[in-house]
């Protein structure tokens, strides 16, 4: 027998899959990006100043959000994030952009419009394993 019972997602007071305005989606991505940095930092994926995570901007498809150069992953807040265009110009934010982050992530986002986010890190364990020159 078919029932018209609402699904678990439909019963959730805030449906995370509900359509959002582009502005709300921007804030959502920035919040999740800041959380991702904190998680990466807590797990030890922020060795030195190397490493970056980006999220495509839903309002401007030629831009992405990225961490500022030299800031610990463990300290990054939404207000610290930089909006960078595909020419390397900081559109929003007052920190310097990591040029390596721009070089890597601008190419990923340009080549793969279906990709919303990308991460690159230099974890202690990753560097140790790579020094062994063994395939995964």
Predicted ranges, named:
Residues 2-136:
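Glycine-rich flexible loops
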